Every structure is written in structure tokens, then in C-alpha cells.
Amino acid sequence: MRAVVVVTGLVVVVVATALSLPNHDVKSATSSRSSSDYQGSSGDDCDEGLPPPDQPFRVVWNHPDNCERIKLHLPLDDYGIIFNKLRVFLGEEIQTLYDTGPWPYISETGKFINGGLPQSFNHPDNDGETQRILKKHRPENFTGLGVLDFETWRAIYSTNFGPMTIYQNESVKLVKEQHPDYDQKKLTKVAEKEWQQAAKDIMSNKLKIAQEVMPRGHWGYYLYPRTWDNKRDTKFRNDKINWLWRQSTGLYPSIYIYDFSKTESAITKFVSDTVGEAVRVQKEFSPPNTPIYPYVMFQTMDNIFHYEDHLKISLGLSAKMGAAGVVLWGTSKHYKESTRQWQCQQLQEHIRTVLGPLVKNVTQMMTDCSRAICEGHGRCVHNSHDVILGETESQRLSDLCSTRQSRFRDYHCRCYSAWEGACCQTLRPSRCQKREQRNVHGGGDLID
């Protein structure tokens, strides 16, 4: 993962645009924190698993802090933050996998590893090694979030720029060796075509193996989907890899903030655009139960905790747009043995005073809204933040249900995949035999 730096000026305006939060008593809300078996998963013919009725929005801890090793308790469960048992990094709730077997890449010294390019990938035991690594970390009956993290090159040829330009250059060189008579335009066109196919073969195969080893997990790649220069370019590029959205059973974009100089509205727009693009590809291409969990950084590489106002953008806006939850990630570099005691005490205090109460507030509000206007069968989406329906249609749906609870008059329902109707009041006809379902990670379907 990459670092993010806090912009200290994000205070009044951004808070207003992120999420209006009622002042809940943080001690009053309850939250389930463990998975249970469910019908309907990425490995089933009947893919209609549901989250628990009290958890339309979940916050998942994926921070390798190591505080439990010194017996310093982080009060995650007090605020409904989901975490792996024994606080392991690879566990039953979430697995972010940096090592998924051999990949082709070019080292910093220019050495071609495993062929260097996807087109030249030549590892003799790729599948076997990938399977062994995944099985080594496989929890029993895994139903959690499965995240493959590979960032050395990108699936879309044209997005390998900056330090990754070498992959475009070497791809063109490879074609030229085979076809010295081609002009530059044709060389580039063929190089792009060969790259796209080879990258697809490798990434799709890794994903397939993960889904076979842990078929009930929600599998996808970190940083996919992402946004580019503008919405037109973003759609064009991401549609080129629609095969990835069709195969993924989890979408894990990043909403880390890198640029100090961005204005408050620009930062809010970035988060909105990124989550919105995930909603779009989920609607157009992904299985109906595919959850969206943006990755959120709450502590920078410079060891600065994000202010509450900044976290409200990341958590609040994701919730308002209908994401299934967020993943909280941080670096382990601050939690080395020499400084771990002090760092863990600082982290404990941050959770108690800032992060924890905010998580409780956001999750409780989305729970209350779901129960009030969606009968607990869907997520609430803010009328001004539905990238699929638009504000006019959102308001029409809102008027049908929000009269039940005026507090949520600016929200409408996005039903879970087993339900339909403006207020998610009708069980959809299904070839599947219904039973009590508790898929804690379910993504929910969008209303057509």
C-alpha cells in the first residue's frame, strides 16, 4: 500500500459535504463482529447472500499494528470495527495478500524477472506455487474479503506511465523484434493488444485460483477500479478490463489522499468519483452480490493520525454512496519493537477519541436508516450521491419511503440482491430455496 498525508485544512466545508451525523451515544450501539455460514457466495450458483440486518455498512481493520504482542488492547470491538481473530493480518474477516506467487516484472536494476513482461511470462509452476501460498493462509470456511495486491504494473497498457513506462517501451521493442517491418503506429497497436491479453491471462488466473481455494471469499484486486483524468477516460479505460469486473466478487478501490494542495471540494470530488466508478462497474459488469470496500488510510507514513474531519469524508461519503463498508489500512513501520509501546498507546487513544466514535456514528446512522426506510433489506443512499439513478429519480424513490421517518428524507433504498421495491419490501422470485442468511460481507444489488 502507499502512504497518504493529511491536509490539515479540511474542516468545515468538507464535513458538511461528507455526512451529516446524528450525535449517537457511542455506548448504545451494538455490532456483530464475526462471520457465520451463509447460503449464497462467490462459489455458489445461488449468489444472494445478505449482510446481517444491523450492518449495512461495515468498517474492517487491516492494520498490522502488532499491539497485541505487547498485550496492549485496542478497543476495536467497542466501536463495531471488524477485525480478524487474534488480530492476525491474514485471517477469517480479511486477507490482503501481497505474495500471490510468481509475477513477471522488471526489477529496479532492469533485470527481467519471470520474463519481465506479461507477454513473456515463463514460470514453470505458477499455478502450483500460487495455490500453495493461498492454502497456507486459508482460514476454515473463509467468507471474508480477499484482496490481491500487485502494483508493479497495471492491467491497462496505456496507464503504465511514469516509472512504469518501461513496460510500454519493452512491449514495443518485443513486437519490433518479431516484426521489424512494422511502423511505429502498428508496433504500438500490436504491443497494446498483446499486453492487454497477457495481463488478463495472468490476473484472471490468479483470481481464479484464489476463488477456487477459498470459494466463499469476496475476491478482487486492490486499486481496482480507479479513476483517471476525467470521467470519459475513466469509463473508456475501465471498460477495457470489464473481464476483471465480471470475475471479481469484491471491489477494492483506494481513496487515499496524496496531494496536499487539493482544495476541500477537490478532495471530496476525488472520493466521490472513485467510489462512484466502483458503483458503476459493479452495476454494469459485476455479479449482483459484489461488495464495494474502498481502502482508507487513517495514519500517514509520517506517523500523523488523520483528523476526524478528514475521516468523515472517507467513511461518510463511502457510506452515503452505498458502499458495503471500508477497509482501514496503515503501515507497520511505526510499530517496530523499539517504539511499539508508545505507538500503540497513541493508536489506542486515537481509536478511543476520534476513530472509534466516528465509526460507531456512521455505522449506526446507516443501520438506523436501513431499518427505518428499507425494512433492513437494503442500504440507504443519499439522493445527491447516487451515480446511477441521479438526484431526480432518487428523490422520487425517497418520497415513497422516507415519509416513514423524516430524519432520512434525503435518502432512498438500494436493495440487497434478494429484495426489490422502492422500500425493499418484496422478496424477489428466485430459483434458490431461501433460508436464514447472514453473509456479513454482502454487496447488495442496485435498483433497476
From Swiss-Prot:
<feature type="active site" description="Proton donor">
    <location>
        <position position="151"/>
    </location>
</feature>
<dbReference type="GO" id="GO:0004415">
    <property type="term" value="F:hyalurononglucosaminidase activity"/>
</dbReference>
<feature type="propeptide">
    <location>
        <begin position="19"/>
        <end position="33"/>
    </location>
</feature>
<keyword id="KW-0326">Glycosidase</keyword>
<feature type="glycosylation site" description="N-linked (GlcNAc...) asparagine">
    <location>
        <position position="141"/>
    </location>
</feature>
<dbReference type="GO" id="GO:0030214">
    <property type="term" value="P:hyaluronan catabolic process"/>
</dbReference>
<keyword id="KW-0964">Secreted</keyword>
<dbReference type="InterPro" id="IPR018155">
    <property type="entry name" value="Hyaluronidase"/>
</dbReference>
<dbReference type="Pfam" id="PF01630">
    <property type="entry name" value="Glyco_hydro_56"/>
</dbReference>
<comment type="function">
    <text>Hyaluronidase catalyzes the hydrolysis of hyaluronic acid (HA), an anionic, nonsulfated glycosaminoglycan distributed widely throughout connective, epithelial, and neural tissues. In venom, they are known to enhance diffusion of the venom by degrading the extracellular matrix.</text>
</comment>
<feature type="compositionally biased region" description="Low complexity">
    <location>
        <begin position="31"/>
        <end position="43"/>
    </location>
</feature>
<feature type="domain" description="EGF-like">
    <location>
        <begin position="413"/>
        <end position="424"/>
    </location>
</feature>
<keyword id="KW-1015">Disulfide bond</keyword>
<feature type="disulfide bond">
    <location>
        <begin position="369"/>
        <end position="380"/>
    </location>
</feature>
<keyword id="KW-0378">Hydrolase</keyword>
<protein>
    <recommendedName>
        <fullName>Hyaluronidase conohyal-Cn1</fullName>
        <ecNumber>3.2.1.35</ecNumber>
    </recommendedName>
</protein>
<keyword id="KW-0245">EGF-like domain</keyword>
<dbReference type="InterPro" id="IPR013785">
    <property type="entry name" value="Aldolase_TIM"/>
</dbReference>
<feature type="disulfide bond">
    <location>
        <begin position="67"/>
        <end position="344"/>
    </location>
</feature>
<feature type="region of interest" description="Disordered">
    <location>
        <begin position="26"/>
        <end position="55"/>
    </location>
</feature>
<feature type="glycosylation site" description="N-linked (GlcNAc...) asparagine">
    <location>
        <position position="169"/>
    </location>
</feature>
<dbReference type="InterPro" id="IPR017853">
    <property type="entry name" value="Glycoside_hydrolase_SF"/>
</dbReference>
<comment type="similarity">
    <text>Belongs to the glycosyl hydrolase 56 family.</text>
</comment>
<dbReference type="GO" id="GO:0005576">
    <property type="term" value="C:extracellular region"/>
</dbReference>
<feature type="disulfide bond">
    <location>
        <begin position="374"/>
        <end position="413"/>
    </location>
</feature>
<feature type="glycosylation site" description="N-linked (GlcNAc...) asparagine">
    <location>
        <position position="361"/>
    </location>
</feature>
<dbReference type="GO" id="GO:0005975">
    <property type="term" value="P:carbohydrate metabolic process"/>
</dbReference>
<keyword id="KW-0732">Signal</keyword>
<keyword id="KW-0325">Glycoprotein</keyword>
<feature type="signal peptide">
    <location>
        <begin position="1"/>
        <end position="18"/>
    </location>
</feature>
<feature type="disulfide bond">
    <location>
        <begin position="415"/>
        <end position="424"/>
    </location>
</feature>
